[in-house]
Regions:
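Intrinsically disordered, low-complexity, mixed-charge
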Residues: 1-100
């Protein structure tokens, strides 16, 4: 039986809106640090309505881990809810950035 030497990772893209106490608590900086540690590309930004929006692109399991960390382990934030929308990955990002 033939098995490929390596199976490419399943790439994913998630757009996440974080709700709760998420602005003014270093959420974006911590999000960027975690995404960089995990090798995820995309961005995070504050929205005018007081929410934080992020787009994560990378290996699906790693993206899921990053969403979980940002939802439940952000040091100073309180995330009441995270709304996740899965999208087709585009490969448009070269790094993870904080947008202003």
């Amino acid at each position: 039986m033939f098995l490929p030497a390596s199976v490419p990772p399943m790439l994913a893209r998630a757009r996440v809106v974080f709700r709760g106490r998420v602005q003014g608590v270093y959420f974006r900086a911590n999000c960027q640090q975690k995404a960089d540690e995990l090798g995820i590309r995309g961005f995070v930004r504050n929205r005018q309505d007081g929410l934080v929006e992020a787009v994560f692109e990378g290996e699906k399991a790693v993206v899921e881990a990053c969403i979980e960390w940002n939802t439940s382990r952000q040091p100073h934030a309180r995330v009441d809810r995270s709304d996740v929308t899965w999208e087709d990955p585009t490969g448009e990002f070269v790094e993870f950035e904080v947008r202003h």
